[in-house]
Amino acid sequence: MAKSQLTTLTRQLIPMTTSMTNILDIIKADYAKFPEAQTYSIYSEDVYFKDPVYNFRGIKQYQKMIGFITFWFKNLKLDLHDISRTDNLIKASWTMSWDAPLPWKPRISVTGWSDLTVDKFAGALENGEGDRELIISHIDYWECSKFDVIKQHFQFLR
């Protein structure tokens, strides 16, 4: 293999590998500081989001949802248990807990996982070169029902 071919091959492989590594690192960092200072630039403009409560499309709606959570859910904590990637699917398992905005401030906890689908977008890097992976779909699943979450608000009624 000629040196120029090897250089071309290296340039093709390194950005892809770096992109894959970087998006996982960014997601880990975002989960650790959630809901503060999220990296919205890793999401496509028309990202699809779904969980047991919300179902919408668009980064602006996603930002509004995070704003709602930030305002109403106090002492919010998102513990990342595991994150892995297979092809274009990133799976993250987590537990989110918060103090509910009620006078008795019950601590609510939901364990679940997120399926994040990524796609490549040409020339999306900050310097205008290369490809960048963006999250095009973010679907959250809970290991409990919505009713189970509601019951946590009123445990004193047992």
Segments predicted by a language model, with ranges:
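C-terminal and inter-domain tail/linker signature
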Residues: 1-158
